[in-house]
Amino acid sequence: IEPQTGKVLQQKELSANLDVTSTPLVTEHEIIFGSADRGVFALDKPTLFIKWRAETLPSLVYTAPYSSTPQAGVETSPVSSQGIVYIGASDGYLYAIDQSTGIIKDKLYFGAPVFSTIAVSGNRMIVCDFAGNVYCFASN
């Protein structure tokens, strides 16, 4: 979007439901975001081509309007640290995704959806789940 005029300069249609309230992670080379039904996407910033998609598991809770099963929702904003994208999902997992390739490097199950964005401070991550738990992890 052209900031001065509001004119759309570029747009991309995806075969995904983007009814999420999270903020995308915008880097020099990519735009990374969650979807309401198909996991996490990374688009090449200059071309808007899909660079990768990381699949999440079916949601434990459906939050997208007019949604039905199966959904693989990601309502949180991604954060990046040392080439890894961290993002919580509606399936109850915290995902660690290689930012370059989209390969899921690790995932941790909480048993309740993760609807809040992960906070990163130094080598520590703070994660809250929908059951009211707060976790603090040291990243490797």
Report each predicted region and the residues it spans:
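Extracytoplasmic beta-rich repeat domains
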Residues: K7-T27, R53-S80, D106-G122
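Blade-level signature of beta-propeller repeat domains, shared across WD40, Kelch, NHL, RCC1
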Residues: F110-N140
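Short loop/turn segments that connect beta-strands within beta-propeller blades
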Residues: E2-G6, D44-L48, D98-G102, S139-N140
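Short coil/turn segments within WD40 beta-propeller repeats
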Residues: R38, D91-Y93, G132
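C-terminal structured "cap/appendage" subdomains that terminate the fold
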Residues: Y86, Y95-I97, I103
